[in-house]
Curated annotation (Swiss-Prot):
It comes from Shewanella halifaxensis (strain HAW-EB4). This is Fatty acid metabolism regulator protein. Transmembrane segments: none annotated. InterPro entries: FA-response_TF_FadR (IPR014178), FadR_C (IPR028374), TF_FadR/GntR_C (IPR008920), Tscrpt_reg_HTH_GntR (IPR000524), WH-like_DNA-bd_sf (IPR036388), WH_DNA-bd_sf (IPR036390). SUPFAM superfamilies: GntR ligand-binding domain-like, Winged helix' DNA-binding domain. The lineage of its organism: Bacteria, Pseudomonadati, Pseudomonadota, Gammaproteobacteria, Alteromonadales. Coiled coil: none annotated. Residues 34-53 bind DNA. One of its GO terms (biological process) is regulation of fatty acid metabolic process.
Length: 239
């Protein structure tokens, strides 16, 4: 098992998670005793204990006082915070994971974009006020797009959408930089921003779903033309 890690704790975490992913520690099974596992991985028991607590918080494990540590079915117990980890564990499935991520984000954003322009149209106008000065670079568009999503999610009146969006952040930001490296993708987005801006100015929230649907289809087609050339490095976080 080849694991790239920046320290003992990172190594231990990646070792255990990969072992769960590869079914060496299958769902419902009991982890080896702390002493045995620390010797197997090559870290101190203190470090291992901290890692196990973190993995339990993320839904990989169940820890109960006086009982052995049990492996969970992470698909049932974890949240969006493990997206980065799944991307690293399954590089061959990364393009499909991104497809699913973008599809989910499009479905959810259609709700909070409409909510933002219905409940806080002036905030949407402010968020879109400087689009004509947006630097024509992948980084600038990726940063602006995420900031816009975040602002409108918060302005929708339901802060839970912000938490959902936060779960996408790391992976979405990296994919966004790649997507917006296409001049056509940037032009498509700018056209969308301008139409959205006009709806916000007009306080016309009823037409937002149709605009979101059209942009979702067009950006989806654009993504399909780019996905096969996506660098594998996009699936790796910096940790």
């Amino acid at each position: 098992m080849i694991i790239n890690a920046k320290g003992p704790a990172s190594f231990a975490e990646k070792y255990i998670v990969r072992s769960i992913w590869e079914n060496k520690f299958p769902p419902g099974s009991i982890l080896p005793a702390e002493r045995e596992l620390s010797e197997l991985i090559g870290v101190t028991r203190t470090t291992l204990r901290e890692v196990l607590q973190r993995l339990a918080r993320d839904g990989w494990l169940t820890i109960q006082h006086g009982k052995p540590t049990r492996v969970n079915n992470f698909w049932e117990t974890s949240g969006l915070n493990i997206l980065e980890t799944i991307a690293e564990l399954n590089p061959d499935g990364f393009p499909e994971l991104v497809d699913q991520l973008l599809s989910a984000r499009s479905s959810v954003s259609a709700i909070y974009f409409r909510g933002a322009i219905r409940n806080s149209p002036d905030e949407a106008v402010v968020a879109l006020a400087n689009i004509n000065e947006l630097e024509d670079t992948a980084q600038a568009y990726a940063d602006f797009d995420y900031a816009l999503q975040h602002t409108l999610a918060f302005s929708s009146g339901n802060p839970l959408y912000v938490l959902i969006l936060n779960g996408f952040k790391g992976l979405y930001s990296r994919v966004g930089r790649y997507y917006f490296s296409s001049a056509e993708a940037r032009a498509l987005a700018m056209d969308f921003y301008k139409q959205l801006q006009q709806l916000a100015i007009d306080k016309n929230y009823t037409d937002v779903p149709a605009l979101m649907r059209t942009y979702g289809i067009n950006s989806g087609v654009m993504w399909q033309s780019l996905r096969d050339d996506m660098p594998v490095e996009l699936g790796h976080s910096d940790t």
